[in-house]
Curated annotation (Swiss-Prot):
It comes from Pelodictyon phaeoclathratiforme (strain DSM 5477 / BU-1). Keywords: Ribonucleoprotein, Ribosomal protein. One of its GO terms (cellular component) is ribonucleoprotein complex. This is Large ribosomal subunit protein bL28. The lineage of its organism: Bacteria, Pseudomonadati, Chlorobiota, Chlorobiia, Chlorobiales. The gene is rpmB. InterPro entries: Ribosomal_bL28 (IPR026569), Ribosomal_bL28/bL31-like_sf (IPR034704), Ribosomal_bL28_bact-type (IPR001383), Ribosomal_bL28_sf (IPR037147). PANTHER family: 39S RIBOSOMAL PROTEIN L28, MITOCHONDRIAL, LARGE RIBOSOMAL SUBUNIT PROTEIN BL28M. One of its GO terms (molecular function) is structural constituent of ribosome. One of its GO terms (biological process) is translation. Belongs to the bacterial ribosomal protein bL28 family. It holds the Pfam family Ribosomal_L28.
């Protein structure tokens, strides 16, 4: 699986790490992804998905209905 959040679409971005001496080094910034088993009440089953920390907050606030719409 790729390093992409299913709900928010966050993916790695590229940029520079800049030191105190202003040296620029190219780097890849990874999203804060976690693999979770989420119970989808509408389908009565568990779904294993990769979610960012922000997506887990969205699911906690709005419920799994938003995730169920994406999986259909």
């Amino acid at each position: 699986m790729s390093k992409v959040c299913l709900l928010t679409g966050k993916r790695p971005i590229y940029g520079n790490t800049v030191s105190h001496a202003n040296n620029h080094v190219r780097t890849r910034f990874e999203p804060n992804l976690h693999t979770k088993r989420i119970w989808i009440e509408e389908e009565k089953r568990f779904v294993k998905v990769k979610l960012s920390a922000k997506a887990m907050t969205i699911i906690a606030k709005t419920g799994t209905a938003t995730l169920a719409k994406l999986l259909k």
